[in-house]
């Protein structure tokens, strides 16, 4: 996969459950944070978009858990994106930094709501050309 963005992160204690591994819900936070940081790297603020009446929202998400992360683990969240009709599809994978093992493979489908209405968006056109 030709990733277009990477974000290193580290697991915090409170993200782990009783089994000592990252709770599954926190992976969705990691993916969302990566998308927001990707936007910022492209010069776009998620909050700024909302103020302009543009709200990218998740329509569907699929996460396949491969190798658990534990407290203190460093990892890299990687992203690839493509446009399919009015959707932007983000292929997001998380890798443990210490050994490169795949921890999660995710596919996140997003759409844009513009002034309260589902709409096609040119939001990532410049980024899409890079892929």
Residue ranges and their predicted role:
Residues 1-58, 113-130:
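Hot-dog-fold acyl-thioester-processing enzymes
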Residues 60-64:
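Short alpha-helix capping/helix-loop boundary micro-motifs
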Residues 3, 65, 70-71, 80-130:
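HotDog/MaoC-like acyl-thioester-processing domains
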């Amino acid at each position: 996969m030709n990733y277009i963005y990477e974000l290193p992160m580290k697991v915090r204690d409170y993200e782990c459950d009783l089994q000592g591994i990252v709770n599954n819900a926190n992976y969705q936070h990691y993916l969302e944070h990566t998308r927001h940081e990707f936007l910022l790297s492209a010069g776009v603020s998620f909050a700024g978009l909302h103020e302009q009446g543009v709200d990218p929202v998740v329509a569907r998400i699929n996460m396949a858990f491969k190798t658990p992360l534990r407290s203190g683990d460093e990892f890299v969240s990687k992203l690839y994106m493509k446009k399919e009709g009015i959707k932007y599809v983000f292929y997001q994978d998380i890798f443990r930094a210490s050994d490169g093992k795949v921890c999660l493979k995710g596919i996140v489908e997003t759409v844009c709501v513009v002034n309260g209405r589902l709409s096609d968006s040119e939001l990532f056109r410049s980024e899409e050309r890079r892929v």
